[in-house]
From Swiss-Prot:
GO biological process: G protein-coupled receptor signaling pathway; regulation of G protein-coupled receptor signaling pathway; regulation of signal transduction; Wnt signaling pathway
Phosphoserine carried by residues: S484, S566, S568
Tissues where the protein occurs: Widely expressed.
Phenotype upon changing I275M: In a breast infiltrating ductal carcinoma sample; somatic mutation
Gene name as annotated: GRK6
Annotated function: Specifically phosphorylates the activated forms of G protein-coupled receptors. Such receptor phosphorylation initiates beta-arrestin-mediated receptor desensitization, internalization, and signaling events leading to their desensitization. Seems to be involved in the desensitization of D2-like dopamine receptors in striatum and chemokine receptor CXCR4 which is critical for CXCL12-induced cell chemotaxis. Phosphorylates rhodopsin (RHO) (in vitro) and a non G-protein-coupled receptor: LRP6 during Wnt signaling (in vitro).
Protein name: G protein-coupled receptor kinase 6
Description of post-translational modifications: It is uncertain whether palmitoylation is on Cys-561 and/or Cys-562 and/or Cys-565.
Lipidation (S-palmitoyl cysteine): C561, C562, C565
Amino acid sequence: MELENIVANTVLLKAREGGGGNRKGKSKKWRQMLQFPHISQCEELRLSLERDYHSLCERQPIGRLLFREFCATRPELSRCVAFLDGVAEYEVTPDDKRKACGRQLTQNFLSHTGPDLIPEVPRQLVTNCTQRLEQGPCKDLFQELTRLTHEYLSVAPFADYLDSIYFNRFLQWKWLERQPVTKNTFRQYRVLGKGGFGEVCACQVRATGKMYACKKLEKKRIKKRKGEAMALNEKQILEKVNSRFVVSLAYAYETKDALCLVLTLMNGGDLKFHIYHMGQAGFPEARAVFYAAEICCGLEDLHRERIVYRDLKPENILLDDHGHIRISDLGLAVHVPEGQTIKGRVGTVGYMAPEVVKNERYTFSPDWWALGCLLYEMIAGQSPFQQRKKKIKREEVERLVKEVPEEYSERFSPQARSLCSQLLCKDPAERLGCRGGSAREVKEHPLFKKLNFKRLGAGMLEPPFKPDPQAIYCKDVLDIEQFSTVKGVELEPTDQDFYQKFATGSVPIPWQNEMVETECFQELNVFGLDGSVPPDLDWKGQPPAPPKKGLLQRLFSRQDCCGNCSDSEEELPTRL
């Protein structure tokens, strides 16, 4: 049986490496799968798409790139884009070099004698910026100028963009994005672990070669446990959050037996594995601080959307190929309505805050408590309120959480102890992160003094540990316990309403990022070299008629469209 595990791991590693060919894991038919429709097929989409500058030109990756291509055709707009890029670079520039970077920005884009003066900038605002720059180059120095530049771009230039071939090309990409997603969109690989309602396995998009984790929720298991609301809640929260520190939902689809969430694949294992199974338990302080800072950013992104996580623990923090973390498993996360509090005694014993244990009302305070527990565990090599592999009754753990201060060893520096103790304050009103400043309070703690959070948020800081690319950081295939068959439950037509709410296909921002990262956008986004309109973007032209199929083709052909095309036999991976 060891052979079975070796084969499964070998096939997965080969897929992660791009299959060893020039296509980097893409199907032989990838261009056919991502073939643009004729623009006339996008008319309904054109009429229904909301004309929002922020969404179309800033948030959506392909929309952002196409708007920039449009701006590159007009010098005054090209200067605006260059200024915005310069500001973004200024904000992540190290402190000791930021003033010089700011001076260069001012000279190029804000001075009348500069080569790239941007339009419609109040001179008084420029004067104020210049003075503030010399006094001290704060990161938000150009914030108002950035807002005014976007305001300028969002009026006449945006209107012109909507009438351009670049926006028409965006409609074609949106048409592809909205095509049905089925199990044939993916290749399936080995099981990685178990979720609450089914297995988690590795998978690969046939059209792009992008690897993901597929979390399968068995329909009968959901129905037996009455888990419909919980499953839909997790899906909708994942769909809403766009953060480099939280796993992304890229697709949601259904098969005959399961609902499937296609999520960011994290190849580096979870923090529980790294804390306890990679030598001495715990991390050096610098490594623990780095992970705590990234988790803080993830919590900040969740809380910005008014989502409280409620299940922060080592096994829910995953490492990617480069050693950065993402928060995973949002099954217990919930939206907190503006101006309201919630109640719910949920979470994991030893990580639940005192107010949760007491069943009191709260907003986001349990997450900051759990961050304190996790930081403590990363440094100490054990949880603050229970020792590993030592059985303590739940009631005793909860008594310790509510009443007994945690103990600190010599492994904690004074600053690390200070941050942990402020996060583990029993009174949520006095806890760091809950005094009115949220994540900002935590980020300003002296333990993070050497960290540039702007650079961290942009993924520009080198992690202290990089996972081995040839390692599989999960249990052997046969060591992952299989689910038993669900008996006594039958699926009914009325269940279909829930399935339709769940299986909504591609999620726009992750899907567009996938197209860009896998270079599909770069290879397919081609316009006429002489400035002419390509046939597929000509509103006056007619879409080409599909080639006629012979009788045998009509009888035996399978439906081929947008990622649902099946590969030839030789391309299919070994399935175990």
